[in-house]
């Protein structure tokens, strides 16, 4: 029988006086309410300890939700939670934005109203919660659903927005703000709509700074890409590990903007796939950024900017509005690029000053041209005082036949050595460019 969560609770010393039907659940507290234990109904309506769900450690609060403005119940629990407390949400939870609190957000980001304000070193845990649904019954700017204080945790949450009150055009709240050393782990954030707020500090659905974002699923987001008003997902000095970003889409391609902005962060073992945001950019910045062992797959996006150290990633079946850019003094090594299409640009990879592009495998790359009569030059790699060595560059049959195709265009300060290409020429190398050991017409 499926468990239905009900608001039965009391002292453990009185638990045997409670009638608890099979499929029901209750919480029993110690006399001083510093400890709690979960009981379920037995087949004779007597309470029995829940196997594997006994909670006897101190500093735990259980909130039983009933679907009616559950933010009030959770706010009450969070307000009395001391450092080290875990607040457990139970049942099917429904949040509204009719009851918000001042988040006390630090200067520089302005004022936010939080629906759930998780304090310093407090954890909000959805282990016993079937789902959390947000209803946008009081639309207003500068709202955030989960505000995490320093060293706060958000864990095991299954969240989605109600698609009758949150729409593609309504003013919607930011989902998450994570402060320094906050942790977001094992959460599902699904069916989310853009905030639709034209401000650089509130144009984000997720904003994390100095925190950890691990083992989460982002699924089914409807976005509106924007110019200079933030990023849909913004990570600054964040450890972003083992997450899945999937089925992100848009109905508004009028402007280009950052789908994901990752600054001075570690971005590793993530999967980004099956998304269609044709003018949404993935943007890395900061020379200490690290992007490795990720998969970017089967998506139609704007462009990708790489910074810091990018290694051992797989980029496969991507339709790009423009190129992949490698920022100055950045390293892009040992990656696989398979089946990339550049739809509007005339360059596939743009290497910044003193960038290194080495040991990469590029196969079946296409530059899409709309006018076959147009006299225009095309570059696979453009190197501006860059180091380009030991790459395999295999083009699609159509791209291989383009007029004025330069596999590598490099200026006099660049180094181009040991590359292999299917094209008949290595490209256009300025006098003074160091060029050695390159192989052409390879098949």
Explain the meaning of each model-derived region:
Residues 1-25, 33, 45-52:
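Extracellular/surface-exposed low-complexity repeats and stalk/linker segments enriched in Gly/Pro
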Residues 17-39, 77, 87:
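Short hydrophobic/aromatic-rich beta-strand motifs
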Residues 59-90, 94-100:
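Acidic Gly/Asp/Thr-rich repetitive segments characteristic of extracellular carbohydrate-active
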Residues 65-72, 94-97, 107-114, 121-173, ...:
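Right-handed parallel beta-helix/beta-spiral solenoid domain characteristic of secreted/periplasmic
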Residues 84-92, 126-132, 152, 157, ...:
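Extracellular beta-strand-rich, repetitive "passenger/adhesive" scaffolds
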Residues 138-140, 150-271, 276-282, 287:
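Right-handed parallel beta-helix
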Residues 404-443:
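Leucine-rich solenoid repeat scaffolds
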């Amino acid at each position: 029988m499926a468990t239905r969560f009900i608001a039965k609770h009391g002292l453990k010393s009185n638990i045997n006086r409670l009638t608890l039907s099979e499929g029901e659940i209750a919480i029993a507290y110690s006399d001083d309410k510093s400890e709690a234990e979960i009981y379920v109904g037995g087949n004779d309506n007597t309470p029995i300890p829940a196997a594997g769900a006994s909670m006897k450690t101190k500093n735990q609060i259980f909130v039983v939700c009933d679907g009616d403005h559950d933010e009030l119940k959770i706010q009450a629990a969070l307000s009395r939670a001391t450092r080290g407390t875990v607040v457990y949400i139970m049942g099917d939870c429904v949040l509204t934005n009719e009851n918000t609190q001042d988040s006390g957000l630090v200067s520089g980001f302005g004022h936010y109203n939080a629906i759930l304000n998780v304090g310093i070193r407090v954890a909000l845990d959805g282990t016993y919660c079937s789902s959390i649904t947000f209803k946008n019954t009081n639309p207003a700017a500068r709202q955030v659903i989960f505000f995490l204080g320093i060293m706060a945790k958000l864990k095991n949450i299954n969240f989605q927005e109600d698609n009758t009150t949150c729409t593609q055009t309504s003013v919607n709240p930011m989902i998450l703000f994570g402060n320094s050393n906050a942790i977001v782990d094992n959460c599902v954030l699904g069916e989310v709509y853009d905030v639709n707020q034209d401000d650089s500090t509130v144009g984000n659905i997720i904003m994390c700074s100095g925190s950890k974002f691990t083992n989460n699923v982002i699924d089914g987001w409807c976005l509106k890409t924007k110019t200079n008003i933030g990023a849909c997902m913004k990570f600054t000095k964040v450890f972003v590990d083992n997450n899945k970003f999937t089925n992100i889409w848009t109905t508004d391609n009028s402007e280009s903007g950052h789908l994901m902005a990752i600054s001075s962060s570690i971005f590793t073992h993530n999967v980004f796939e099956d998304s269609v945001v044709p003018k949404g950019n993935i943007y890395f910045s900061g020379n200490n950024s690290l992007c490795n062992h990720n998969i970017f797959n089967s998506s139609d996006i704007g462009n990708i900017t790489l910074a810091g150290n990018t290694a051992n990633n797989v980029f496969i079946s991507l339709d790009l509005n423009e190129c992949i850019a490698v920022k100055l003094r950045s390293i892009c090594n040992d990656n696989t690029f398979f089946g990339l299409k550049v739809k509007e640009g005339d360059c596939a990879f743009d290497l910044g000053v003193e960038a290194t592009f080495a040991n990469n495998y590029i196969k079946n790359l296409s530059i899409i041209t709309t006018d076959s009569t147009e006299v225009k030059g095309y570059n696979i790699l453009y190197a501006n005082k860059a180091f380009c060595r030991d790459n395999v560059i295999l083009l699609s049959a159509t791209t291989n036949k383009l007029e004025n195709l330069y596999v590598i265009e490099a200026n006099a300060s660049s180094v181009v050595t040991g590359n292999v290409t299917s094209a008949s020429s290595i490209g256009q190398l300025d006098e003074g460019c160091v060029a050695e050991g390159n192989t052409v017409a390879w098949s």
